[in-house]
């Protein structure tokens, strides 16, 4: 089992230079790891174990298993609440009249592992776009200043290069910042879109699935209907047709056990809560980003928080002279440069922008 998750270890590696933020990393690191781990877990049980076992008289078990795996199994929604052993064999499994009773096919069953992996790819796309657009700019600008132990001459030279870079490229870096903001918006569109994608995949059951499970746990035992048994039944029906000795069509009703649904029901409960929380946090992050894009005062407060060692007047000078792109690059550098060196960089940059000589 540990080998199954071994391929996920590479995603846990931390980057030496930070080019985004914690919320962004929840999308392309935490969520991608979760989805790939779940996909591997389902795959290991699906293709190493036995994903379906069907029972029916007169039909070889291997044939029935293969047939029901390909053509999907079903339950009868109006048999979900019958008494097990008396009215129904299992929740949703009972006698039904073809054409009269509604049947619900569970076509998602064999596709769960592929869909989870596809979702992981979608969550990585905004990160891939930003990494491509960013082009290693922050890594190039850091120039080993993320270490507190730097030769004084090298430190002075690299600080001068940074100050000259900002002075030369002043007011030309807005597009760089806007591309990051676009990727943040894509994160939000992606997570909300995936909630509705999973709802479509599970035949309209996902958007209320988590809240239904919570409501189920709070209800009295005799009044409640298990939503997990409705969406992810462990026992289903499968109808097999074949020709009899006289050439007439014979119909056989079989019972199928779906062991993977024991895992699937837990996976999708977790994903419901994770996606809802992630979409709320990302929405709040977009409001925060809008505030920074529209409010110079907000940017000044954030820069002051990032460079607490720098005097107030230097922060105000930089905030007044810089546009959002310049502020964003400087703010990102603050995440990667040693605080003492960053304080000196802010001081030198403030002097440069004021037209003073840097000593």
Curated annotation (Swiss-Prot):
Pfam families assigned: Innexin
Single annotated GO MF: gap junction channel activity
Topology Cytoplasmic: residue spans: 1-22, 131-180, 288-359
GO CC terms, sorted: gap junction; plasma membrane
UniProt KW Chloroplast keyword: no
GO biological process: monoatomic ion transmembrane transport; phototransduction
Domain of life: Eukaryota
Protein name: Innexin inx2
Species name: Schistocerca americana
Taxonomic lineage from the root: Eukaryota, Metazoa, Ecdysozoa, Arthropoda, Hexapoda
């Amino acid at each position: 089992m540990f080998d199954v998750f071994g391929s996920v270890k590479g995603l846990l590696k931390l980057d030496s230079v930070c080019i985004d933020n914690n919320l962004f990393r929840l999308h392309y690191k935490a969520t991608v790891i979760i989805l790939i781990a779940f996909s591997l877990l389902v795959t290991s049980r699906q293709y190493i174990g036995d994903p379906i076992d069907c029972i029916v008289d007169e039909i070889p078990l291997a044939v029935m298993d293969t047939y029901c795996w390909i053509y999907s199994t079903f339950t009868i929604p109006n048999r979900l609440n019958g008494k097990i052993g008396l009215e129904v064999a299992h929740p949703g499994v009972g006698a039904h009249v073809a054409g009269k009773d509604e049947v619900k096919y569970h076509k998602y069953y064999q596709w769960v592992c592929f869909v989870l992996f596809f979702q992981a790819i979608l969550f990585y796309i905004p990160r891939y776009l930003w990494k491509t657009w960013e082009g290693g700019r922050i890594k190039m600008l850091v120039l080993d200043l993320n270490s507190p132990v730097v030769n004084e001459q090298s430190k002075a030279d690299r600080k001068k290069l940074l100050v000259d870079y900002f002075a030369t490229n002043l007011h030309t870096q807005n597009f760089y910042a806007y591309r990051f903001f676009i990727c943040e918006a894509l994160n939000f569109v992606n997570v909300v879109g995936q909630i509705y994608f999973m709802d479509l995949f599970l035949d309209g059951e996902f958007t209320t699935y988590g809240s239904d499970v919570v409501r189920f746990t709070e209800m009295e035992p005799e009044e409640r209907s298990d939503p997990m048994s409705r969406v992810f039944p462990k026992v289903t029906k499968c109808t097999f047709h074949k020709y009899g000795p006289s050439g007439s069509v014979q119909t056989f009703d079989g019972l199928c056990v779906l062991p993977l649904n024991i895992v699937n029901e837990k996976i999708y409960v977790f994903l419901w809560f994770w996606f809802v929380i992630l979409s709320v946090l990302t929405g709040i992050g977009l409001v925060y980003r809008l505030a920074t894009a529209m409010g110079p005062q907000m940017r000044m407060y954030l820069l002051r928080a990032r460079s607490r060692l720098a005097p107030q007047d230097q922060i105000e000078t930089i905030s007044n002279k810089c546009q959002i792109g310049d502020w964003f690059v400087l703010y990102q550098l603050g995440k990667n440069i040693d605080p003492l060196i960053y304080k000196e960089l802010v001081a030198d940059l403030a002097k440069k922008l004021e037209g003073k000589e840097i000593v």
